[in-house]
């Protein structure tokens, strides 16, 4: 999903917020437009925004997301001359303090926020002075950031709009995973994950002063004794004793599996004893030479010493907890520009403290490889999500007591930290996509009387909680009941009204306004004509004549004032007209705080298929993509490509999954990635390096002098363009080039016949050579070196995409670490720095190994960055044309 604010020039447009601008008009505090309640504690389904730029240069109102026109109405022209009193009274758009514009646009948005999670919602832009197109009709397409009109007047104040986001119950449920109550499922959604991760840790979980997963201890291996047989220490028996694996002991001591057979006998002395008859007898290993590193023991095993050890002796190899969690804690993992912050809250959402992991996001690949060597890919997901979402299962060698440990340092309060296993028994993992209640997300849906006065006890309890002794809201008595002695009921009504007054005052304050922005409220639209009396006749009440308990201050409008308000409302209303135009939303529906909605959904990094297809420009320079009609762009992302290259099906799903896994969480990161792969793949046409058997063999395996001469004679211009010639004449090239290919083959690990073609460049970013395939396979605990597995990197969309994400996250860049050329692991380090040409160049180097196609990569990036991010306008290039749906 791509979404942006209706104004782009400021990070978040300003709401007209001055407390002293309160005026009555249709249940709103005019100029303020507070959500979800305003004047008289009446419902108000949106907010009022001020267009940046002032009167001199106000920014146009823009569509917040791709969508289609449901209804558009130009505003009644504002009279140029100052009206007389009679003219003001006669014109319904002059009300209270001045003119109010009645131009309006309603957009319907259909998008995706996860795999198979399609949602529909509506955005409403009221009080426009003009609309962008007077001839708009229902169904016309509008794209995100397109100007849709200009802000108008609200009661005499210029450059303002009323802005709403609404949806029906079914789509609220698709959007949030539920449509009522708190988040109580045992696990967050797996097909809709984005934003921050939240892990609920139960009470009673062990706390450690150090990370027990990475702690090691010294162990002196017992000297080999040929008379004791099987009781000698073996690599396997030591691993069993310390509840680990031989592979982990080898890794801790810097040895490989291939070295185990020679290393272990030398450690125990078995080798030295066997060589006792040799001419030069090797010395028996000392205690120091028999000392190895073993993992520290923790958990249940720490309390269960082997039969031959006492608990006191066993303790030297264990890590004991320093305490246990005393209550349920919620740990949030939040990443920004490579840094990870772990925020601890209690179940009510109150913040306890936080711990920072500087560059933890950039270094996540290394952490996964070091911590979960059996299957780093599964560990990588555990570190990022607090659970494993993809197909890669954790290796048995990485498990502890049947579970994959996930130790992180967390804050218990402002001054105390400890390590805790965030994947211990009883933990639950969620994401922002689950809209957890501890962040404040609250459903308000108990006001069912259909009027525009807030009669919600849910909302009142949230703003002004009832004291334990306070009676519930009464049904106010009639005159006969008063005569019979209903003084106590009247007193209860007075108390309730006092509570309303306190709640009304609190609702105007910044802290409570922030809290209320997380409410999702079912209320009637304020823009319907035919039910005005039902929604507003309570304004005519007279003090002393059976007042309604939930009226804050009786207004007691007379007939003339009430009719004038009604005429004003009729001039602004549009709901029935929109229904005639095709609007299918019920008058009573769910309202989001629109700015909170946009802010929350901007964290959604899942892109719909339509949004992805737009990233392939309809026209670009010939060496970039050339002409690409909408149908071709759509097919390359969905059905793949089989002409002039091969692109597997369902790349729209595979890339979204990969982006989620490898932290492509911002439009900037995604734009940099697509710019690179579009050039690497020929504008998304191929996932494999082109070339016949001879080309691939002589590039990556072996080149004979005769073949080198043929290349010099027949492909000299190409050799020069690729940088292979380097000014050499024919004899020199023929003499030197075969050796260069031999060295390249050795560096790539291409040591078997046919390895050149077998391990050609494959994937959205090419992995090349046996070693490249092997290391990627070790990351995922999958064999990609045995035929036919190598081809999966190009014919399986999930592997083609995942291998590119792996390349990006694992790439180590060596540079001066200044400006755009940041050094270290993970290309995100450079992608996060900016959107200039120099940034694209800095990313091209680790992806391409040079600067081939740099101009096209920069061209792609500028266009894609416009599509995905909040850039106002298309790049100024005659070669580029925006992709739109036919």
Features from the language model and the residues they span:
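Surface-exposed, glycine-biased beta-strand/turn segments
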Residues: 1-103, 108-115, 136-138, 143-147, ...
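Cell-wall glycan-active module
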Residues: 1-36, 42, 115-116, 166-744, ...
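Extracytoplasmic
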Residues: 44-46, 58, 64, 102, ...
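Active-site rim elements
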Residues: 48, 239, 787-795, 848
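Glycine-rich, acidic and aromatic/proline-enriched surface loops and short helix-turn segments
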Residues: 69, 74-75, 104-114, 621, ...
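Beta-strand/loop nucleic-acid-binding surfaces
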Residues: 122-132
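Active-site loop architecture of trypsin-fold serine endopeptidases
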Residues: 151-162, 166, 255-258
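A structural motif
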Residues: 754-784
